[in-house]
C-alpha cells in the first residue's frame, strides 16, 4: 500500500507501547505521525527514535512558547532528535518566531541535514468566540 504524506496520524496515547502498536498496525500505509504533549512528556525522545528507526516522519506538536532564547534552544535540541516538523505558539510574538526559525536552520546546517518545517499555531481549535473574547482580542474567530 502506498502512503500519502498529507496524512498525519496522531499518536495520542499515554504509553510508548500503545504508540508502537499503532505504528506497527498501520505499517506502510502511513509515513507521518504527530507526537503531542501527552506522549512526548510521558516517554520523551524514545518515541522519536522509534519512529525514525521505522522510517517515519515526525510532527512534534508541542506548541512551544516562552522567551525567544528558551524556545530557540529547545528547538535546536528537538531538531537534533530528528523531528521533521515542529510548532510554536504565535502568541509568543514575532521575535520568538524569528529566533525559532533561525535556530532550526542553524541546527540543520550544523548537522548537514534539511531543516525541519516550523509552523505557528495562532489559535487553538478548541476555542469558541466566548473564550476568544476572554483574551481581550478585538476581533472574533472567523
Model regions and ranges:
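N-terminal amphipathic alpha-helix/helix-capping segment at the start of soluble metabolic enzymes
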Residues: 1-21, 109-115
Amino acid at each position: 500500500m502506498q502512503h500519502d504524506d498529507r496524512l498525519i496520524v496522531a499518536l495520542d496515547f499515554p504509553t510508548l507501547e500503545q504508540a508502537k502498536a499503532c505504528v506497527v498496525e498501520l505499517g506502510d500505509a502511513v509515513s507521518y505521525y504527530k507526537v503531542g504533549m501527552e506522549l512526548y512528556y510521558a516517554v520523551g525522545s524514545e518515541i522519536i527514535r522509534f519512529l525514525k528507526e521505522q522510517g517515519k516522519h515526525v510532527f512534534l506538536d508541542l506548541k512551544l512558547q516562552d522567551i525567544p532564547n528558551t524556545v530557540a534552544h529547545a528547538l535546536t535540541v528537538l531538531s537534533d532528535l530528528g523531528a521533521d516538523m515542529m510548532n510554536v505558539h504565535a502568541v509568543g510574538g514575532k521575535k520568538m518566531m524569528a529566533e525559532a526559525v533561525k535556530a532550526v536552520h542553524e541546527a540543520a546546517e550544523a548537522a548537514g541535514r534539511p531543516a525541519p518545517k516550523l509552523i505557528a499555531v495562532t489559535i487553538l481549535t478548541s476555542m469558541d468566540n466566548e473564550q476568544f473574547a476572554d483574551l481581550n482580542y478585538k476581533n472574533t474567530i472567523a
